[in-house]
Each structure stands twice: as C-alpha cells, then as structure tokens.
C-alpha cells in the first residue's frame, strides 16, 4: 500500500516538474526589470515610422528575435498609413486615444477609438492603420524582429522623396 502512495507522489512530482520546468527555464536568463515612468528613456522612433513619434524600449530588443515591450508616444495629429507586421502584437493605450482601422486605406470614419486602458490584439499580417488626435502613449508587446510593411510603398517614410 505504501509503495503505491510513494509511486503516486513521485509521478506527481515528475508531472509538476514537466509543467513548471519550461516556464522556469524560459525566464532563467532574463534579469528582472523595474522601471518607473520618470526613468523611461525616450528616443526618436525608427525611420520606418513617420517623424514625430518617440519610442522607449522597456524589455528585449525589437530588432532581434524574441519578445519585446516598447512604448510609443505620438503627438496630436500623428498618422501611420495602412501597413502590417509579420508578428502578432498586443497593444494597450496608456494615455490619450489611439484610433485603429482595419483596411488598406486610412478612413477616420471607420476607425475604432481606444482610450486610456483600452486593449487591442492584432494578429500578424493584418492590414491596419493608426492615428491620434491628441498626444497618446501606447505599450506594444510583441516578438521581434519588429517590422512595418506599408501597403502603399510610397507611404514608407524611408522611401519618401526628399
């Protein structure tokens, strides 16, 4: 009788280790990060984004494979032309209001308004656009490398005629 209980305990411990092991290993090489708002370092958004936005990398490296967390700060009147990304992204509005539309043309009338606290999950390769009427800050969680492919290549700020 005791042998049966001992075997069940051992099997239970093995099952727990199998479930917990990958989760523990996943973050084992990552140091914990604590960042307060005043400590965030904002820089100009990459050249693939329209000028005027600021970005802060909170975790990971958007230019490399793997998870990352960034914040994007946009001025009033900021617009990102229709585009798509290779990876899924989760977006949370921290302040202001972000307008998102799912189409190949920017149409302010059909955009969804997401105010502070609002959340949007966007599967990879979905065509969309975004704009803000007031200064807005969003947090984006995704996997790198981050890319932005404009539906109309002429909308790509990197290819804009100077």
Identify the meaning behind each predicted range.
Residues 80-82, 100-101, 122, 127-133:
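Short beta-strand His + acidic residue motifs that chelate non-heme Fe in jelly-roll/DSBH
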Residues 24-68, 153-162:
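A short, N-terminal "cap"/entry segment at the start of jelly-roll beta-barrel domains
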Residues 75-78, 84-105:
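Glycine- and acidic-residue-biased ligand/ion/polar-headgroup-sensing regions
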């Amino acid at each position: 009788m005791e042998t049966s209980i001992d075997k069940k305990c051992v099997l239970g411990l093995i099952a727990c280790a199998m479930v917990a092991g990958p989760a523990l290993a996943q973050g084992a090489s990552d140091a914990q990060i604590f960042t307060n708002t005043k400590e965030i370092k904002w820089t100009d958004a990459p050249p693939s984004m329209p000028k005027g936005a600021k970005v802060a990398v909170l975790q990971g490296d958007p230019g490399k494979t793997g998870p990352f967390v960034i914040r994007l700060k946009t001025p009033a009147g900021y617009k990102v032309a229709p585009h798509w990304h290779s990876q899924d992204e989760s977006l949370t509005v921290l302040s202001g209001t972000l307008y998102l539309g799912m189409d190949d043309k920017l149409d302010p009338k059909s955009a969804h308004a997401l105010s502070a606290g609002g959340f949007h999950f966007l599967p990879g390769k979905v065509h969309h656009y975004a704009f803000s009427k007031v200064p807005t800050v969003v947090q984006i969680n995704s996997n790198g490398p981050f890319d932005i492919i404009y539906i109309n290549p002429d909308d790509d700020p990197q290819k804009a005629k100077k």
